[in-house]
């Protein structure tokens, strides 16, 4: 706790634009709560802020003494929530092995369209990049395909609610537990069972909305169709099997969306 407080004081004076919250820190790792829209790694040679860059600034002393910044569980730019970061080579190797052995447990919260007919469901469906098998206007878009990598996700309904919007009125808060770690896994699996994530520009109501967003940015039309400017997915829990875990609540934007007109 003292180390976290010291970090906060240093960043208040040195880096006032710190864009994440420190949840826990030891000599081996730091756990942070990433806000939506913050990139994990640089994707272009620009000055856009990234979690990796800010962590390197935060851990400059450790890096100068032989440490490193190794992000263990990567999140998409729009996904918020917990990220585990190794500060040493030994810790990075250890966490990598835990990931391979599926001993690093991850749980997400997602807001989806509609009320599922089930309370708990396991989706076991292999995923592959769509462009390998058919035309795809979006290079990174994934699809369910038997030739792809195995992927399994467990879903549980946490809350059903009604909210009057321009695009629908029934929504659910879902807990998603991925048993594998494929690209866009939770989003594709939810879309495949007819309940895409609210705000999802690629797997939501129409993939052309993503292309429109790339061309024009956020518009009134996109807001009316998607309701949220980012997909409603949050990394809510991380746990090392048999050791310890971390939790973080829904961020303000998703918590406010879950304030229903009526809850079932």
Predicted regions and their residues:
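Intrinsic disorder/low-complexity segments
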Residues: 1-15
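Glycine-rich, phosphate-binding/catalytic loops in enzymes
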Residues: 47-50, 100-104
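Short beta-strand segments enriched for Tyr within beta-sheet-rich domains
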Residues: 95, 182-190
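Short hydrophobic/aromatic beta-strand micro-patches
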Residues: 85-87, 111-113, 177
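Residue-level signal for inorganic ion chemistry
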Residues: 33-34, 84, 110, 155, ...
